[in-house]
Amino acid sequence: MTPSVPRASGAPPGGYRGSGNRSGPAYQPAFGAADRLGPPSRPESPRLRLTAAVWLAVWELARMLPESLVFGVADLGGRLAHRVSVRARARVARNLARVLPAATDAELSRAVRGAFRSYARYWVEAFRAADLDPADLDARTTTDGFAHLDAALEGGRGVVVLLAHHGSWDVAGRWAETHGYHLAVVVEVLRPRRLFERFVRLREAFGVEVVPLRRRGASGSEVGGPLGGGLQRVAAANHMIGLLADRDMSRTGVEVSLFGESAPLPRGPVVLSQRTGAPIVPITMLQRPGRRWHLQVLPAVDVDGLAPQAAVARVARALEQLVLLDPVQWHCFSPVWTADRPPRQRRSHAAPAPT
């Protein structure tokens, strides 16, 4: 049974403002995204089906075993993956070298190893997110910067939450829903489909609305396209829309400077903000020692009236600030910068906007 999202009234837990309008009808989330997708366009291979079965088995073990054991095994797995995954290790090193240009070789090596350990922890936390007791989650979480988010919501036009593959974003969604902040997230439809659908149901189980995005490699994959109506409905109800913005998966992004080097970034946050009037607010859930977290909200990004190039460049500055909160927690296991992408994935862009 999926939760409902009532009209905001009074103070949510902890005195946070919460999202939603103070008057008018209750918002009805569009849960059941996995059921509306329909079957995959082509049958999945036996290898993909086996991959799904293995991941789902690991998922169940992560939920069933004692917390200390699960996190200990995950940390060991992250260390092992760092040792044996030569290609991934090199890719993470290239990415983090841009973020930490002054790091020595030894410092960069430690950061890369830490990135693998952080990523392993992310997966365990995602698997266990729906089982987190709200009171326990609250006790383990500190927050900062919520004045930025609450001020943005006072405008009544929703908020575009600027996310990166950083920290533990599924735990952030769980925390948000237990404190009166309703979140809809745009996620790309991935294979194996069975595993993707499990993640959709996980997020919906604790109240996060999932908006699936099919990769098309054209303007149809942008949030300003076919998805726009559903997302605008969320914004009109003064709720939050989460968009991962540190990777251009559609190949229709805008080339801007990111940590001093050219990289394509998605235009979705800018398109949605300019169409709805919803401010862009960067947020991350930082992992802390002892299985604790810190939820950090950064100042809103003003893109009102800016051309796409300048607007996405401004978003890039916000992403830099977010990543620099703890570069080790940036799960940058894919090519980000243009120089690292295969030629077939590159396209002609305008010159990077000035910072």
Question: Where does each model-flagged region fall?
Answer:
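Residue-level preference for nonpolar/small residues embedded in alpha-helices
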Residues: 54, 88, 168, 195, ...
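Membrane-anchoring hydrophobic helices of lipid-metabolizing enzymes
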Residues: 3-7, 12-163, 196-201, 207, ...
